[in-house]
Amino acid sequence: MMRVLVAMIGILTALQAQPSYAQTVNITADMASSTFTVGARTFEISRTQDPDATLQGEFAKTNRPCPDFCIQPMIIASGVAPIGELEVIAFLQTEVAAGTGILIDARLPDWYEKGAIPAAVNVPFAALGAENPYLADILHALGAIEVNGEMTFDAAQDLVVYDNGAWDEQATRAITSLITAGYPASMIKNYRGGLQDWLHFGLSTVLP
Amino acid sequence: MIRSVVALFVFALLLCGYIVLRPGTPPRALTGDDMAVTRGLGDSILGPVPDVIASLDTTVVTPAPLRAPAPSLNVLTDNARMAETTANVLAGLGLNVAPTPDTTTADPMRDLTASVLSGIGQITGKQVTAGGETPAPNTSLEMLVVQALQQGQSDAYIDTIVNEAAKAGTITVPQGLVTANGNVDTAVLLYSLIEKARAAAGEPPLPPSGANEGVEFLSDDTEFRRVYTVGSGDSLGAIAIKFYGSVDKSDVIYQANRDVLSSPNAIQIGQRLAIPELAG
């Protein structure tokens, strides 16, 4: 009789071992994850498979003092389109993977080093200010070309800029500085939700 | 008989418990600490996550390769300062020159820019070779000059090899050393070497070369200004020697003309540069 009991418990344990490992938290109904290759590196974006996960730590805060952490406008400058997570992922899969676009993390390095959106490049807003004597080098790296002392951006990269979230002005400052430097607003998009919204959906981050 | 009834009862109890508890309570109980960031961080420290674990509940993270050294995106220039280049050449020649006290010792913008350029280089793939290997180091400008000087080559020879290497993109050149024609101003580099070597030997500094061609003196009611019109073959370093007798002062001219100069190497023929009086 003991053996029957043991066998039944064994069956139960086997049942217990199988379930709930299939992905159930997709990005969209028909996209579980997004994989793309940039240069020699392959990135994958998916979501945490825990339906009970909540935001923790720094990104769980709702009421940072304003100033300095004030609610940012949806439209930072005329021509700069605000976008969401799916557009960011599509941008990575198409433009960044093809080398025609760069996802810019506008936060200062200490933030960036704690975790960033996969394939993002850290271009802190401070580096884009007119007070940076090496700003031209950065613009060149982004594809701007100097013709007779004038910067031209015809061959420059399309940019998506983000920061910590809608309460953070680092992306706003970066975009404003880029436009001041002559970067066409139509080539810049703003992921306004930033890392806070990205994490709110449990999307993958990387350590640079 | 009793035992089998008890056994069936226990089994039924366990089955009920299993059915009741199963939904919403996965075997690996997740706590608040399992937040995406926390796990993301742990994963990339540990390296690639095995597939089995990844399929459980972990956000898959591709670990980033180590940060490559700052790339030289511009064929001709990098952010190094003349003083560093000069000190390296002299050190390469075996001359022990005390490090110049640099008035701009900490240049956070330069460091910030270098890491930005490194990041962009990695993504655009211009600097990162396939397989994530670090790019082969460039032959340095310093090495070229040291070798040529040790061989006793002429200034013209050094000028030629440096410019050829710069155009081929195999060396990088410090700020302020590119002329309005886009060449490397080797004369200024050599001048800087002599200047530092003299200073190291306790000899007086060279006087400003002080040619007056292209110089205008303007004055209005409040101030007296010197303006210099950039000529063919001028570099910011050469202009600094002309007016101040030292390559190191090229930054003074650059800072005074930030409105027209996008970088110390972006000077153009015909540009009118303010030449400030040195304070003190």
Report the location of each language-model feature:
Chain A
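Flexible, polar/low-complexity N-terminal or interdomain linker segments that lie immediately upstream
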Residues: 21-114
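C-terminal segment of classical bacterial N-terminal signal peptides
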Residues: 12-21
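Solvent-exposed loop/turn segments at secondary-structure junctions
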Residues: 108-112, 127-130, 165-169, 194-198
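Active-site neighborhoods of enzymes that stabilize oxyanions during catalysis
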Residues: 201-208
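Catalytic cysteine-centered active loop of the rhodanese-like fold, especially the PTP/DSP P-loop
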Residues: 139-197
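Mid-length scaffold segments of soluble, non-membrane domains
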Residues: 93-157
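Phosphate/oxyanion-binding active-site loops and adjacent basic polyanion-contact surfaces
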Residues: 77-84, 128-135, 167-170
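Bacterial N-terminal signal peptides that target proteins for export
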Residues: 1-7
